[in-house]
Amino acid sequence: MDSTNSKREFIKSALEANINRRAAVSLFDRFGGSSAVFEKQFQDAQHAVRAHGALKREAELGTLVRKAGQRFEALKRERSILRQPRDLPRVADIDALVDAVADLKEEVAVRLDALEENGEETPTHSSSEIKDTIVRWRLDDLPPVCPETP
């Protein structure tokens, strides 16, 4: 989320997903789950939710990559400051860093694969899955409740 445009796109997708979810819930209440209008809105809402989720995951991946890059640059600067051989980091520290970078690289690859898979799938939904999704969306829209309410 570096540029202003990507932040705007993220906010736009969040609003679009929320509006589409609310419209789908409203159409379900008004016309029922077997209505063509509801089915179209439900598909659009799920597409918007998936698109927003993909943007969210991309932002998280960008943050991970940026953090790994910052960590690498910090260690590189530290290493350049340490000129004496006795002041160099131990081999165990370097091995730990290499392992951490490999783990981050693996995690990024897994998440990128998941992003690619999520973008291509067009699942079919049963009526119970649709009803469960509608109930979950209704619960998401409820206002928060204070745990200390008497």
Curated annotation (Swiss-Prot):
InterPro entries: DUF848 (IPR008566). It comes from the Viruses. This is Protein ORF35.
